[in-house]
Design a protein with these regions (language model features):
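Hydrophobic, aliphatic-enriched repeat segments that assemble into extended interaction scaffolds
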Residues: 105-114, 129-140, 321, 325-345
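Auxiliary Fe-S-binding modules of radical SAM enzymes
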Residues: 2-41, 46-47, 294, 298, ...
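A structural signal for well-ordered alpha-helical segments within the folded catalytic domains
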Residues: 107, 214, 397-400
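Flexible, acidic/Gly-rich N-terminal and inter-domain linker regions that tether
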Residues: 1-98, 103, 107-111, 119, ...
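Acidic/polar N-terminal loop/beta-strand segments that form early-domain functional surfaces
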Residues: 102, 114-117, 126, 151, ...
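Conserved AdoMet/S-adenosylmethionine-binding subsite of the radical SAM
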Residues: 161-394
Length: 451
């Protein structure tokens, strides 16, 4: 087993350990009442907030809140990897396969959708993950040897309907249906996105300093050379900064490799709406916003599609008209024409940590944050793994307020099916495929030659 210690490309001056005057507290009923929270939560919610506070207190004391820069390198058997479909709803527009070469994440986001902000697990990267990517691309999007039958199309559509029902009623059965969908997709060269990387940061130190990211991109280049009619498309969503894109391995940078994929890929920047000082604490090893937008600029200067943003998480109390204008003006100035908004979703244990860190900077924002999430009537507004979203009426109002402004500056909006269903957003407000060709997470439908 190989191991390595690495240096980060970016690191903020202050982190959760060195934040002047901060130490964790217990968020319970008494704390919320003293803060001025007028919403009365359920006993279960109070218990989870208190439990999360105690866990955070222990992790802060033991200095295990942030990931450590220690990496274990392993190999895998490409044919034995369990192919994952990126689909939380069963209604995603195109079958999307996940590329996840790292277990854990070095960026260390304290609101992480995958780990609920816990980064204590060992970072593990698979050095030969590119061989799995080669195998998957060939199996799914190598030139088909025969025409697809109507029965196969019906079978795929039927399995997707089963998947949608399973996710809602029997999540434990999701894997089995995904395997069947993968099997029926094999050898068909259907339209597929390959998402690099939904469960971790694609362009982080463990993938860059080892060359793993470079090798994965080279596999896509190799695939298109061998199969020029392939309907595989690469989707990269990232918090990377310019330094990440310019990281060189064996004589080539990530940007060099992107240039060879420019008509087969898209690069979507991931940015959040929250106070800057708060963001520095919550995203300890992510590139600053100005560096992420510089990465967008580098892509666009080279003709690489980089016109969409994942705007997440959005902290609702911070979403004032002034902040809406300044945030989206900044994106639009860099050529961003589409955004996918998503409000913070958090389990109550994680919310207790996020709330008190926010309160260190602004107690009014902390109070508003709890009030947006903990009311009993909002307890069923949950995403996967029990993560609570903000009040539905507030969410709809905030989406409309963002859209009212972004339409004025020529930006379109796309949303995932889960948000569409939960908030009952119709095609009249946000079309499935919008005027700029974007859908769902910000997938660009125009990347496929048959659309």
């Amino acid at each position: 087993m190989k191991q390595m210690v690495f240096e980060n490309f970016y690191q903020h001056e202050t982190d959760v350990y060195s934040l002047e005057g901060f130490s964790p507290v217990i968020v319970d009923r008494a704390y919320l009442e003293k803060l001025g929270v007028t919403v009365h939560a359920s006993e279960e919610t109070y218990a989870k907030l208190e439990a999360g506070s105690r866990v955070f207190m222990e992790r802060w004391k033991n200095r295990t809140v942030l990931p450590v820069q220690h990496l274990v390198l392993e190999d895998l058997v490409p044919e034995e990897v369990d192919t994952e479909i990126h689909n939380y709803t069963g209604r995603c527009p195109t079958l999307t396969f996940e590329i996840n070469p790292v277990k854990g994440c070095n960026v260390g986001c304290q609101y992480c959708l995958v780990t609920d902000g816990v980064h204590e697990q060992q970072l593990v990267a698979y050095e030969n993950y590119h061989l799995y990517v080669r195998y998957l691309l060939k199996e799914m999007n190598g030139t088909p040897t025969r025409e697809v039958t109507a029965e196969e199309l019906r079978r795929k559509d039927g399995l997707l309907k089963e998947l949608a029902q399973c996710i809602e009623k029997n999540p434990a059965g999701k894997k089995d249906i995904e395997r069947r969908i993968t099997e029926v997709s094999r050898g068909k060269n259907w339209n597929h996105y390959y998402y690099f990387s939904p469960k971790t940061e694609a362009l982080q130190e463990p993938t860059l300093r080892t060359g793993i990211a470079h090798r994965i991109l080279k596999e896509f280049i190799r695939h298109y050379e061998e199969y020029p009619d392939s309907n595989a498309r690469l989707f990269v969503a990232s918090k990377a900064g310019a330094k990440h894109l310019l990281c060189e391995y064996e004589g080539e940078t990530i940007l060099d490799l992107f240039c060879q994929l420019k008509d087969k890929m898209q690069y979507n920047v991931s940015v959040s709406i929250m106070p800057d000082a708060f963001r520095d604490i919550l995203e300890p090893y992510a590139a600053p916003i100005e560096e992420r937008l510089k990465a967008v600029r580098l892509c666009r200067e080279k003709g690489i599609p980089a016109e969409a943003a994942l705007v997440q998480p959005i902290f609702t109390p911070y979403l004032t008209p002034e902040h809406i204008r300044s945030f989206f003006d900044r994106l639009r100035a860099e050529g961003i024409i589409n955004y996918k908004p998503e409000f913070l979703t958090a389990c109550m244990e994680n919310l207790a940590m996020l709330g008190q860190i926010l309160g260190h900077f602004d107690k009014d924002l902390e109070r508003a944050l709890y009030e947006d999430y903990i009311m009993p009537e909002n307890s069923d507004h949950k995403k996967q793994r029990g993560r609570t979203a903000p009040d539905r009426a507030l969410s709809i109002d905030n989406i409309r307020r963002m859209m009212d402004y972004t339409k004025q500056i020529g930006m379109s909006t796309s949303i995932c099916y889960w948000v569409r269903k939960q908030l009952r957003i119709g095609n009249d407000l946000i079309p499935i495929i919008n005027e700029n060709g974007f859908q769902c997470l910000g997938y660009q439908s125009k990347l496929f030659k048959n659309q």
